[in-house]
Amino acid sequence: SEGTRKWDGEPYDMSGWDEVYGLSLRKIVGDDGVKLPPPSFSTAIKISDLKNIDVIGIDMDEISFTESYTKNISTWQLFKRGRLEKSMTKSGIEGQTPEEIALNMESSIRGLSGFANLERERVKTMAENIRLQSGRQKKILAIIEISNVSDFVEELN
């Protein structure tokens, strides 16, 4: 949240996947509809700041993410993901709505077992952190990537 809060509006280096997603999304919504950082995050932070509401990250911290990444992602998985990204850069991502594009992109990436395992571990961490916060907070608004929502809800139940 701190990076989004302090972003100066200047262009920044995107990952290849952000670029592929943005190009595919642009075909549906046009140039003005593609925004990074995502408006859901930046708007939530602005409203939280105005109302003096804490913004708390629930995803893995950098150390946990790095450990999970190195445990789950092999060199072969990285190679396959690179080829997948290259292929999707050429052909785009199927979908008629931004949601379909996001879900189809994530589904393709998660077809690689290491990346699927990494996302499962991220979702588990997010659910654990929400449970921790629910003991401290009366109300919680969680902004979760659409590709993780169903697994996140399942993990909470």
Regions from the language model: what does each represent?
Residues 1-157:
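Compositional signal for N-terminal targeting/processing segments
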